[in-house]
Amino acid sequence: MRSLLFSLTALVLAGCVQTPHKPMPDDPYYAPVLPEERAQPVVPTGSLFQDAYADNLYSDIKARRLGDIITVTLREQTTASKTATTETSKESTAELAAPTAFGRNITVGGNPLSAGINGTREFSGDGSSDQSNQLNGEITVTVIKVLPNGNLIVRGEKWMRINTGDEYIRLTGMIRPQDITAANQIPSTRVANARIEYSGTGSLAQVQEQGWLTRFFNSPIWPF
């Protein structure tokens, strides 16, 4: 009785487990990284050419340093489809001839003895699964680290307040400077180890979540 009560208590507690902590804006993990401070310019000497106004004639606007920003164009589209069909059948037959004694069939109640076994088993199963996802948009991220080979680690987030809820996009990943366009943009398909998160908070997001009692009945440990 005690073990049964303990099991029921565990089931109730499992169904009451709360969902993970809601994301909040201004997360320090996604805070922009400030660029490194440059050396102070030389004091003006009266010359026509001053270091404070010098620039590289062959430089471009592409992100390449710590703290630089770059715009990622979200072009994510995935489609998956799977179909499985299984059919099996098996048929077995066994017969035992009527026994004889002294050249005559042995009978019971005038009926000859005989035995036979027939068995048939069949199984048929079909399954299919289709899934499609699409995400379009733009998000501007910050270079948080420059690797020795020149690749850039980028990270950033964007929050949008819509009525009583918030929509947010978060992105982290690694990019190659060669993939950055002249407009300082890069498609999300060129981001390695990309982690893209798009979701929302507020009343609209809350109505899409299951209540604690529904989670209890839908938990994997529910025996029925």
Swiss-Prot record:
Protein keywords: Bacterial flagellum, Cell outer membrane, Lipoprotein, Membrane, Palmitate, Signal
Taken from the UniProt entry, a GO cellular component term is: bacterial-type flagellum basal body, distal rod, L ring
Q: Which Gene Ontology terms describe the biological processes this protein takes part in?
A: bacterial-type flagellum-dependent cell motility
Name the InterPro entries for this protein.
Answer: Flag_Lring
Function per UniProt: Assembles around the rod to form the L-ring and probably protects the motor/basal body from shearing forces during rotation.
Q: How does the record describe its quaternary structure?
A: The basal body constitutes a major portion of the flagellar organelle and consists of four rings (L,P,S, and M) mounted on a central rod.
Could you tell me which NCBIfam families the record lists for this protein?
Answer: PRK00249.1-4, PRK12698.1
Q: What is this protein called?
A: Flagellar L-ring protein
**What gene is it encoded by?**
flgH
